[in-house]
Amino acid sequence: MIQYPEPLAKLIESYTKLPGIGQKTATRLAFYTLSMQEDDVTNFAKSLLSAKRDLHNCSICGNITEDDPCPICRDKTRDHSQILVVEQSQDVMAMERMHEYHGLYHVLHGVISPVAGTGPEDINITSLLKRLKKDDEVKEIIIATNASSDGELTAGYLAKLIKPAGIKVTRLAHGLSVGADIDYADEMTLFKAVQGRTEM
């Protein structure tokens, strides 16, 4: 087995902690980092630290933001009667690229997953329920969890919790292929999924 110098081995190990990055890709990234100009490496490191230090979750919707509440929650021109529930912050970015949805969001930061041992208490559901109790302006919850088994399980669980409150609960149309992540979908697919949403 190749013995890399300790600083290089630690850099490779750090890259392997990123999702989807295996040993081979991590090694390639580490060697590329070593070939970069020192100023570029410094700026890269500063960007990582700045993002970790300055970004946090919005206290209302859970989306990543610098300010609290986030710009979307503060925007009075948006439709406050609709909340679109997504798994991750990158799903919000995907929906915003579409420029067709003008309501609010709620980020779960995960899904209910029996296999992974993730229960309802492990994701951002309680804050959604509290939000709905405080805000009688909300008329529709659009559930936009991914079209995976865990996404469907989470959608069903949310619908059972929310519908008794008299709030309309809808699900994105199945234009998204099974197992597909929302943040990988193109704008037209997302537009059709929102427009064709069905009541649960």
From Swiss-Prot:
InterPro entries registered for this protein in UniProt: DNA_Rcmb_RecR (IPR000093), Rcmb_RecR (IPR023627), Rcmb_RecR_Znf (IPR015967), TOPRIM_dom (IPR006171), TOPRIM_RecR (IPR034137)
Cross-referenced PROSITE patterns: RECR, TOPRIM
Keywords assigned by UniProt, alphabetized: DNA damage, DNA recombination, DNA repair, Metal-binding, Zinc, Zinc-finger
GO biological process: DNA recombination; DNA repair
Mapped zinc finger ranges (C4-type): 58-73
Example of a GO MF term: zinc ion binding
UniProt superkingdom: Bacteria
SUPFAM superfamilies: Recombination protein RecR (SSF111304)
Stretches assigned to the Toprim domain: 81-177
Keyword Ubl conjugation: no
PANTHER family reported in the protein's UniProt record: RECOMBINATION PROTEIN RECR
UniProt similarity note: Belongs to the RecR family.
Its biological purpose: May play a role in DNA repair. It seems to be involved in an RecBC-independent recombinational process of DNA repair. It may act with RecF and RecO.
Protein name in the entry: Recombination protein RecR
